């Protein structure tokens, strides 16, 4: 840039040696002669002061070391969109091809051209582009009016993340020329958003908008969304968003909403987006949430909130109460949940226990933490849940005869699906209530008998094995003990509580506990 400065540089985004900043001041800084730019760095550790020099405040920074004064010729104000595309996507012709002469007719006159093939080839390359990635390419503006529409009219997907765009208006100047644009990513641009209304239909074809780390507020989200009538996916990660109002005439077509890492969001704010009619996926990772309630739905009922929500992500939060998952069972359409790295679920040794409890708590769930819930696993989880809280159920007034059930409100609130599980599998038997609870004592040692139905000469053994031991490890132990290859071993078990019923242990990756093996049961080993 030249040393001639004008006031319109204030607020523009710039790059200096790979670091991004915003211009806050342009002018003279005595006693040193010549023009200076005062910039506020995105990385405050890059700066030296707060915008003042020798007692005079030239501009203000959010951080005491966020500012610097820089000569204009050291600053990169960026490039326009079309130039950035050419720099990245147009293949340069060799010098010999550039010198080729060609006769073309313009009007009635023959005109001799040099490099005409090269120009046509470049235009052809640009017009065919449908997906463009210009991340960190110092794009600052749209460029010449109409140039984008003429040069690359077929673009459908654009990544403009981490560039030098300073305003939403500049984004619109680019996107408005791309009539087929469906996906737009402007993350990591410090954008100034409009304070007035935005004309609807500006980005009529847009389906996916990514605004992560742009500093946008919720009110600005709603204003920008007015220009995206067909929007289906909206990403707003890391913006310090506070949901201040309910979207009424906007976001009605959105199917996916990502609000991750917005620590100001709480449970009450989520009610404001709970009526979006088509919202199917909601990502709430790392927002600090610990509870969620649907007060419009009683025990065993479904809420009217989030009517279409199928997939919920609540990773990296503060969920520490099982009641959280009881509430999720009220969501009528929920089929998939991800809840990794929460206080209730982040202990590796309790991972299987937590998974089973969550499955038992949410009846319609099909996928948990991206792992499919097979019918066998659901049955196992629900039976263990029924058994684990059987004594509590009985003490709270539970009875095998439904007419004699007098369950306390406290128990029904803590275990809203328990009655349903009793209807599904039958009330827990007395012998079940006398055994140790499988979910609560996951790593208990089980005393088991080991028999060999096809080897009558083998002596019956008695072994203590941890309930968490996998079938694969049990086979390994028996292989060493019997001198028989692991691949030849077939395991099953029977319980004295159910004589004559033999259950195969067919999945090597599952634990003894998974198959409800208990103290006193008998392992049957065949080869």
From Swiss-Prot:
GO terms for biological process: microtubule cytoskeleton organization; mitotic spindle organization; post-chaperonin tubulin folding pathway. GO terms for cellular component: cytoplasm; cytoskeleton. Transmembrane segments: none annotated. The lineage of its organism: Eukaryota, Metazoa, Chordata, Craniata, Vertebrata. It holds the Pfam family CAP_GLY. This is Tubulin-specific chaperone E. The modification Phosphoserine is found at residue 495. InterPro entries: CAP-Gly_dom_sf, CAP-Gly_domain, LRR_dom_sf, Ubiquitin-like_dom, Ubiquitin-like_domsf, Ubl_TBCE. The modification N-acetylserine is found at residue 2. Residues 27-71 form the CAP-Gly domain.
